[in-house]
Design a protein with these regions (language model features):
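Conserved alpha-helical substructure of the radical SAM core
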Residues: 7-129
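Conserved N-terminal ligand/cofactor-binding loop architecture of enzyme catalytic domains
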Residues: 1
Length: 129
């Protein structure tokens, strides 16, 4: 079953998407870990992957979730976020996780994603947007 699913995904998915996924998560992810190991040997610490909580708001009220929906909305503005991502890319990172709250409540999320086509973004979402 898993082999059929993998075969179907490889054959029916747009080849550009498969290539970009393999490049960003495969080679660039491996390279990011190798650079991280080299930094550790030099006594420097900078994580191989960066997870960023870009907003504290959410449209749901899930039991057990840490997001305080009664709290005033706070978000990272676009320019500081670009600087953070660019600095991480200079350190060899190409994999970023965007979390929140609900990341798609950040009005400029697509601007952020479009500005960094050389990076892979994993967006942690509740799926309602």
């Amino acid at each position: 079953m898993y082999m059929r699913l993998a075969k179907r995904m490889l054959l029916e998915t747009d080849k550009r998407l498969v290539w970009k996924l393999a490049w960003n998560m495969g080679f660039r992810g491996w390279r990011s870990v190798q650079k991280h190991k080299a930094r550790l040997k030099r006594g420097e610490f900078f994580p191989p992957y960066l997870y960023i909580s870009i907003i504290n708001s959410c449209n749901l009220r899930c039991q057990g979730c840490w997001v305080d929906v009664g709290h005033k909305q706070e978000k990272i503005e676009v320019e500081p976020l670009h600087r953070m991502i660019n600095e991480a890319k200079r350190m060899g990172n190409s994999f970023f996780g965007l979390l929140g709250g609900e990341p798609f409540m950040h009005k400029q999320i697509f601007e952020i994603l479009e500005a960094h086509p050389d990076a892979y973004f994993q967006v942690f979402t509740n799926g309602h947007f």
